[in-house]
C-alpha cells in the first residue's frame, strides 16, 4: 500500500500536470478571495474565512475530478493495472494506496491555504479578532469532504477506462451531492422529503462544520461515504 501511495505522489509531482493543477487551484482561489469585487475579503468587511469555505468545495469538485480521473482508468487502458495485480499486493491495497495519495494531495492543498488564516488574523481589528473555533472546524469539515470526494472519484476512475467519462461522472455526482439535491428541494412545492434528503447531502454535513459545530453524525457520514465507495 505504501509503495502505491509513494508511486502516485511521485508521478504527480514529477509531471507538469501536477504543477498546472496546483497552480490553477490557487489562482482560482486567489481571484475569488482577494480580487473579484463580488467575493473578495476586503469588501466583505468582516475578518472571516467564510467566503473561502463557501467557494473552495466547488473548486475541489474540479480539482479532485481531475486528479482521480486517470488514477485507475489510465492504468487499465495502458494495461499496467493488471501488472500491479500480478504483484504480491491485494486489489484493496492498490485502491487504498491510490485513495490515500489523492486524499493526501487534497489535504496538502488545504494545508497550503493556512496563510489565508494568518492574513485574516493580522488584518483583523483589533488584532486576532477572529473566530478560530469556526475556522478550525471548517478545516476539519473540508478535510472530510475532500476525503469523501476522492473516494467517489476513484470509484468512477475504476469504473470507466475513458478518463473524460470518469471526470464528467465525478463532477456530476459531486455537484449533485453538494448542490443538486438542494436545487431539487427548492423546486419541491410539497417539501415532504426536504429534511430527509438534506441529511444525505455533502452541503448539509459540511455546513455543520463551517458553523463551528463538530457534530459526530456529520463526521460519521463522511467516513461512511469514504468506506462505502472504497468497498464498492
Predicted regions and their residues:
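Hydrophobic alpha-helical transmembrane segments
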Residues: 1-63, 67-70, 220, 225-232
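Terminal transmembrane helical anchor/hairpin motif
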Residues: 36-50, 166-232
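Transmembrane helix boundary and interhelical loop/hinge segments in multi-pass membrane proteins
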Residues: 67-87, 99
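Short coil/turn motifs that cap or connect alpha-helices
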Residues: 90-91
Amino acid at each position: 500500500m505504501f509503495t502505491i501511495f509513494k508511486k502516485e505522489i511521485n508521478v504527480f509531482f514529477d509531471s507538469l500536470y501536477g504543477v498546472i493543477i496546483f497552480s490553477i487551484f490557487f489562482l482560482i482561489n486567489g481571484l475569488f478571495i482577494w480580487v473579484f469585487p463580488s467575493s473578495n475579503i476586503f469588501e466583505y468587511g468582516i475578518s472571516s474565512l467564510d467566503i473561502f469555505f463557501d467557494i473552495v468545495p466547488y473548486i475541489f469538485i474540479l480539482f479532485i475530478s481531475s486528479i482521480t480521473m486517470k488514477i485507475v482508468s489510465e492504468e487499465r487502458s495502458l494495461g499496467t493495472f493488471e501488472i500491479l495485480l500480478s504483484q504480491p499486493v491485494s486489489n484493496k491495497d492498490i485502491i487504498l494506496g491510490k485513495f490515500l495519495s489523492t486524499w493526501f494531495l487534497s489535504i496538502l492543498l488545504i494545508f497550503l491555504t493556512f496563510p489565508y488564516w494568518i492574513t485574516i488574523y493580522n488584518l483583523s481589528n483589533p488584532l486576532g479578532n477572529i473566530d478560530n473555533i469556526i475556522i478550525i472546524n471548517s478545516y476539519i469539515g473540508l478535510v472530510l469532504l475532500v476525503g469523501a470526494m476522492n473516494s467517489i472519484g476513484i470509484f468512477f476512475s475504476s469504473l470507466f477506462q475513458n478518463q473524460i467519462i470518469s471526470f464528467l461522472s465525478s463532477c456530476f455526482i459531486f455537484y449533485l451531492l453538494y448542490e443538486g439535491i438542494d436545487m431539487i428541494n427548492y423546486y419541491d412545492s410539497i417539501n415532504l422529503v426536504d429534511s430527509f434528503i438534506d441529511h444525505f447531502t455533502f452541503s448539509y454535513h459540511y455546513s455543520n462544520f463551517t458553523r463551528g459545530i463538530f457534530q459526530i453524525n456529520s463526521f460519521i457520514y463522511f467516513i461512511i461515504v469514504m468506506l462505502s465507495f472504497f468497498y464498492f
